[in-house]
């Protein structure tokens, strides 16, 4: 079991490093956008409150009459578009690095293409392949997430107007929505990284002449029932791999090596 564990750990280490680097940058993007957007929302909401006559509660209709509200909408759209663009650029770059890194990590000592590598163009094509049953690409999910965030932020603004909440309460509500959106983005990163890890490993094994692979699930307390049932199950190298089996899945695939071969982790 030694080499299987070593193989899985090698892949997991590289994937974990890629995820941490990506998350660090994502947090910066989200923090900057959140600070700018919330400040704009607070100014707009406070302006609405200041325009109300003594004792009169504002309504959504009052909000829509403000030029500041429509300026806010344009600014919000601009900020979220920049956030989405930055995410798309970051993820594209990190996913390509992940694919190349995993592909180049493993090799069989006696394979003819021991030091073969994969180029960026091929890696880019591989990471852009649609693999989920809903037919959506990872890039389209970025924009779905930003659209949801935009709607949620505006819904919370209207909610504050209707319920008469304070500006400080609005800020808390908006921060919560940004946290939800970040968690969706983080889940996307982790799930796609796992898929790319599987893709790259499968292609490397195939190029090395491996005929069969085995699913290897982490054996810690976080291993779920689904992954536990897949552990050590074997699949033909040209088949569809069952992992990642769910969002944030940590399973890997390792080659079924013939007795005369030893696995090399570069």
Predicted segments, located by residue:
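N-terminal leader/targeting and assembly helices and adjacent pre-domain segments
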Residues: 1-175, 260-266
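Acidic, glycine-rich two-metal-ion catalytic cores of nucleic acid-processing enzymes
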Residues: 172, 176-266
